[in-house]
Amino acid sequence: FAITTEHLTATVAAQGCSSEVRRGDLVLVRTGQLSRARRDGWGDYAGGAAPGLSFTTADWLHDSEIAAIATDTWGFEVRPNEFDVAFQPLHQVAIPNIGLFLGEMWDLDALAEDCAEDGTYEFFLTAAPIPVTGAVGAPVNPIAVK
């Protein structure tokens, strides 16, 4: 399932004013993919078909001026990719050209449940990577404080 700009803006609108996306924000997108893997088995979770952001969201990612976006999927963007000429093309645009931090495989279930319960989708979030000199990616320990 390809998540489009329309899906993102509709979700923000449905969640209300505490879900407004502002410059510098870290946006979290929960698809339920990690929950499904826990329930049904890991199978092809890492490498198989998965919901994720459509390549068409690149303009929204840039125009919104967010600092980062993270999902509960293994690859952030929809798999299989929307066209065959490039592997994970949204990565190829978002990282070097937008300068966007991408988070993958984030466990968002407890946070999503808490947000739905109190109707507040705004919180302080930190996700410091382990310090590895010269690395282009590293595990993080995300912490949300409401």
Report the location of each language-model feature.
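Active-/binding-site microenvironments in catalytic and ligand-binding cores
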Residues: 1-146
